[in-house]
Amino acid sequence: MCGIVGYIGTEQAAPIILDGLSKLEYRGYDSAGMAIFDGEKINTRKAVGRLKVLENLTHGGENMKGTSGIGHTRWATHGAPSDINSHPHMNNAGTIAVVHNGIIENYIPLKKKMQDKGYQFVSETDTEVLAHLLDYYYKGNPLEAITKVLHRVEGSYALGIMFADQPDKIFAARKDSPLIVGKSDNGSFIASDVPAILKYTRTVYYVDNQEVVELQQGSLRFFSVDEEEIEKQPVTIDWDANAAEKAGYEHFMLKEIYEQPKTINDTISPRIKDNDIVIEELNMSDEEIKEITKIHIVALSLIHI
């Protein structure tokens, strides 16, 4: 899996993005990159290897100044691991940047059509098609361009997008690949998973399928793929950020194995009241619960209980 982190606000974006990407290393990757708007143009840095390579290249983000940006850790699907194939990808003018998780299934015919229109491709990726499609449809209205592109592509995606002439906004979109957004007093965030931004905010919104999000400093607007605005309710994350870290263990499998007693206790304890088990979310009586004959467990983890 790949990882996405985006930020727009009052703080320097690059260190925040690097920190967020470090919290997504468990997803696996072979390269990493960032795009940062410096007040005049979008600058990119990309590198094959561990995130540390990108951190060293950018001096921990200190030599990429700007308060808005998007970052990505890539696990190669279309195209070998290389600096060129790493994200972000740009349009030919360098005014639109895109990071993408997922697979664009119809990228080959789309790429041919864009090449016929004169667009120059520099990578082997399916993602670069998105940058050129956005360029083709962009007439000053980012939401319109994004939704037109989403109507044309087939497959799965989670996207982070920047336009150089929209310095106070970044955008996100999703279909079948996980994506969240969040906000704080100092800015707004995009992430593939909660741990990436939990250090900065506990107020998050889960982006649903075929939704587009416009992010500004401290504000979020949600739209359907048909450009209809959507009202969404935030979720407050109340679990400990340390649960997402390796906490000194060599790897996550060891951490999960040794944390089983605590995990069982943390799961069961809130459900015990007055020597009885209470699961209010089920909205079922004791008699109805006793009639249950089968329990199906679905889990996404190295282990499950």
What is each of the regions a protein language model found here?
Residues 303-305:
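Conserved small/polar residues in nucleotide/adenosyl-binding loops
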Residues 1-255, 259-299:
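Conserved short alpha-helical segments that host acidic/polar catalytic motifs at enzyme active sites
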